[in-house]
Amino acid sequence: FAGHGDTMELPGGGEMGYLIPVDGSTNDLYLSSIGMAELRNLALMSKAKHVLYLVDACYGGLAAVGTRGLIPTETNNYIDKISKNKARQIITAGGKGEKVLEKSELGHSVFTVNLRRGLQEGNADVNSDGYITGNELAMYLEEKVTNDSENMQTPHYGRMTSDEGEIIFVSS
């Protein structure tokens, strides 16, 4: 998804993030936008083993759970294990109150440019093992987007379930 995001404060405390489509309205988020709870439900209903949402929008209320995955250096056959387990992951371009930075000289947003560099050029293969995991991609984007946007936006990453799998890309 590339577009806008917004956050609505909930009456009972907390907040809910929304993705706003081109015909959506910030004055009517619930009826005209896609709530993160709905996005999470779609991920849970999917029969796919691995789901990664890449959201080129900034908002709060990330639909993630606070679990940690397996640790590569401490897990035998790490790639084998994370590829066998289900994964529901999300990476967003930034958080609540931030704006997606578009640079005309780049032709895309800072998030999209770094996403392409990370995957197409293999720059997100942090440990140089020939694979780019969702976690590696998130760490790469967090560093590069934050720097390239001059601290105006910082990508957020999370898991939508407690599953320990990860999306995996083969590095070129």
Identify what each model region corresponds to.
Residues 1-172:
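Cysteine endopeptidase catalytic domains of the caspase/legumain-like
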